[in-house]
Amino acid sequence: MKKLLLTALCVLFLLVVMPLHGVAGGAVTLKMAMYQPANHAFVRYYTAMMPMVEKITGGKIKIKIYHSATLLRSTEMDVGINKGVADIGFSYPPMMSASIPFLGLTDLPGIWRDTKGFNDAFDNGLTELYEEAYYQAGLTNLKVIGLTNIGFWYPCANTKKEVRVPADMKGLKIKGMGRMHVKYVDACGGTGVNVPIAECYESIERGVIDGCTGFTSNFVSWKLMEPCKYFVDFAPGLGPMMLIVNKKSLERKVPKELREPLLEILTLLVKAHRGVMLADDAYNHDIVMPQHMKYYRPNAEERKAWIEAGRPLVEEWLSKTGALGKKAMEIVEKYNQR
């Protein structure tokens, strides 16, 4: 993956840098908002790539990263970038699903076959539908560049007992990493709760909550694997990170000659990151997390039970998203046939 990325960047260098040496004006600095902490694999990747962006554009564009929610929190990302608080940023779309139901699509349990189906769907129509959903909701300054993912999410790591099937969630108070996760915990028979992720470790350690859902990056970067003892090794779905840009910032700050090359570079980085993140996800899952938690891997029948528990959430989502949701689900099903 690293060789592929470097090769692609070299091609971009030949196609983009040489013409850009004739572009007049000084360097443009754009603000990129990320809510993940500095040690998160997501932040590390883009921090390493930004000097390449500057080099490829002949020093004409600099992108400064504001990580750890220093510029925008996760719940503020979409609206904040639309307002121009940041020029560029990574949104976790389901965070906005309460006000824009369509954005909850990626967190729906049981609809994704695998990472290929996920990526193929977004590369063949879903990305454009997300931009349409933003537009319909009044966030008209947002341009969607592309979508990467932060790996698989899991329904329960806890301190109390081994969980094998959804019914075993009964009696457990579980923090959900997002609105849909909370609803899925409820649908499985547990009690889904909202706790700020920065408070999650202490809440589990003190017994305020029994555990959490999460991505492998949550368990490792936030160390949530440490107070938890049991982990159900079934992934209902994948998590998205969407790169969005403020259109007005692009037009106002970036010279016309640089806009398309910049978008091409950012699109490439997003797609290349998919492989980088999944490698990190696999390392966390296979090597790091088992040192702290006892895994239970559901059998085929038990996996069906976990998928069935999420069916009502899929139906509810479809009922709230109308024609746009129907069109999106058709794309999902086309590229995720089992």
Feature annotation, model-predicted:
Residues M1-T29, R338:
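Short, low-complexity disordered leader/linker segments with a strong preference
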Residues L15-V16, R44, T127:
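Residues in and immediately flanking transmembrane alpha helices
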Residues V17-M18, L129, V270-A272:
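A short hydrophobic/aromatic micro-motif that marks alpha-helical segments and, especially, helix-coil
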Residues V23-F118, Y134-R338:
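N-terminal secretory/targeting leader peptides
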Residues D120-A133:
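Signature of the catalytic double-stranded beta-helix
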